[in-house]
C-alpha cells in the first residue's frame, strides 16, 4: 500500500466545511450529502440522567427552562468571602494569644468581638440579626408579639387592618406572676402544711372556735333526741353511751362479805382507825376497792349470774390443783 504524500494539498467539503485530500473528498462528499438530508432527533442528555435515579424528567426540564430563562447561566449568590476570611484570621490569632498567655502566665487577652455579617438584617424589636430569608419570617412575628406585650392595636400580617374591639392582650411572664401573687393574697389564707415520716405533705388542722361550738351543739341535740325517744328503757349500759355513776360517798361503801339486805357500814373516824388493828383496815380498804366497781346500778339477776360464774371458776381451779 502506497503511503500518502504529507505535502499533498487538501480541499474543503462544501457541506460540512471539513478538509480532505482530493481522492478522499470525492467519497466523503456523497456520504455527507446523504447525512445532511436525514432529520435526526437531538440527543436529550436530561432524559438519560433521569433514567435510573430518583429524579423525574419533569424536574430536569424545569431546571433547564429556568436556566434558559436566565441566559443559560444560573445566578450565583453573592458571598462576602473576604469578610469571612478576615473573621477566621482574627479567631485564629486570638486563640494563639490565649495559648501563649497560658504557657507564660501572662494576663489573658480580652475575648474577640463577635462580628455580625454585613448582609444580615437587624430586627428593630428584639435587636437580633438574621439573614434576608429568615428576617422576612421573623420580623412580622416579632412585631405582633411586641404589640401584644404593649397592649396596643395588633396589625395582621396579611394587610393593614387592625384587630380592635374584643381583642384580649396576653400578659407577659412578669405580669402573669404578679397576677398570680395578687390572687393568692386576695384569697383566703391557706392552711400550713407539714411533712410526715414518709415525706408526704400533711395539712395541719386548724379548728376555729365557731367550728367547735357548732359541733358541741350538734352533739347536744343528738343526745337530747336519743334520750327523748328511749326514755322508757334503761339506757345506762346500752351501746355507745357511758353509764352515769352516782357520786361516791364514804357511807355508800359496802363490804364484800356483807349481805345485800344488810345495812351499809358506817365510816370510821380517824380516832377509831387508830384503835382498830392493821388487818381490819387492810380488809376494809380491799372491800372498798371491790365495792367501788359495783357502785353503778345493775339488775340483781345479772349480778347473781356473775357471782355464780365466779364461784364455778374458783371450784374448777381448786379441783385442778388437788
From Swiss-Prot:
Q: Where does Zn(2+) 2 bind?
A: 123, 126, 138, 142
Q: Which cofactor does it need?
A: Zn(2+)
Q: Where is the sequence biased in composition, kind Basic and acidic residues?
A: 174-220, 296-305
Task: List zinc finger spans: C2HC/C3H-type.
Answer: 9-38, 119-148
* Residue ranges, annotated region (Disordered): 150-322
> Where are the compositionally biased (Polar residues) regions?
150-159, 221-238, 264-274
Kindly state which keywords UniProt assigns to this record, in alphabetical order: Metal-binding, Repeat, Zinc, Zinc-finger
The parts of the chain that form a coiled coil are none
Binding positions (Zn(2+) 1): 13, 16, 28, 32
Query: GO MF terms on file?
Result: zinc ion binding
Q: What is this protein called?
A: Zinc finger C2HC domain-containing protein zchc-1A
Amino acid at each position: 500500500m502506497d503511503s500518502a504524500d504529507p505535502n499533498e494539498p487538501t480541499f474543503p467539503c462544501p457541506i460540512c466545511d471539513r478538509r480532505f485530500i482530493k481522492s478522499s473528498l470525492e467519497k466523503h462528499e456523497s456520504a455527507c450529502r446523504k447525512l445532511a438530508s436525514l432529520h435526526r432527533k437531538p440527543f436529550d442528555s436530561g432524559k438519560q440522567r433521569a433514567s435510573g435515579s430518583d429524579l423525574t424528567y419533569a424536574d430536569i426540564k424545569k431546571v433547564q427552562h429556568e436556566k434558559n430563562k436566565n441566559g443559560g447561566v444560573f445566578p450565583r449568590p453573592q458571598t462576602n468571602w473576604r469578610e469571612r476570611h478576615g473573621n477566621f484570621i482574627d479567631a485564629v490569632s486570638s486563640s494563639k494569644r490565649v495559648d501563649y498567655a497560658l504557657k507564660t502566665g501572662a494576663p489573658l487577652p480580652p475575648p474577640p468581638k463577635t462580628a455580625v455579617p454585613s448582609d444580615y438584617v437587624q430586627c428593630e424589636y428584639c435587636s437580633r440579626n438574621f439573614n434576608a430569608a429568615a428576617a422576612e419570617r421573623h420580623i412580622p412575628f416579632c412585631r405582633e408579639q411586641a404589640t401584644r406585650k404593649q397592649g396596643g392595636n395588633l396589625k395582621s400580617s396579611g394587610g393593614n387592618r387592625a384587630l380592635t374591639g374584643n381583642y384580649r392582650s396576653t400578659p407577659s411572664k412578669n405580669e402573669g406572676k404578679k397576677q398570680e401573687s395578687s390572687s393568692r393574697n386576695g384569697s383566703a389564707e391557706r392552711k400550713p402544711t407539714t411533712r410526715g415520716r414518709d415525706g408526704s405533705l400533711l395539712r395541719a388542722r386548724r379548728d376555729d372556735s365557731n367550728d367547735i361550738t357548732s359541733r358541741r351543739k350538734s352533739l347536744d341535740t343528738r343526745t337530747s333526741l336519743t334520750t327523748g325517744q328511749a326514755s322508757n328503757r334503761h339506757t345506762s349500759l346500752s351501746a355507745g353511751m357511758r353509764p352515769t355513776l352516782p357520786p361516791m360517798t364514804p357511807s355508800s361503801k359496802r363490804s364484800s362479805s356483807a349481805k345485800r339486805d344488810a345495812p351499809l357500814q358506817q365510816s370510821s373516824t380517824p380516832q377509831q382507825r387508830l384503835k382498830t388493828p392493821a388487818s381490819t383496815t387492810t380488809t376494809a380498804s380491799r372491800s372498798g376497792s371491790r365495792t367501788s366497781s359495783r357502785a353503778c346500778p345493775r339488775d340483781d339477776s345479772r349480778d347473781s349470774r356473775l357471782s355464780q360464774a365466779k364461784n364455778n371458776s374458783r371450784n374448777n381451779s381448786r379441783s385442778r390443783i388437788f
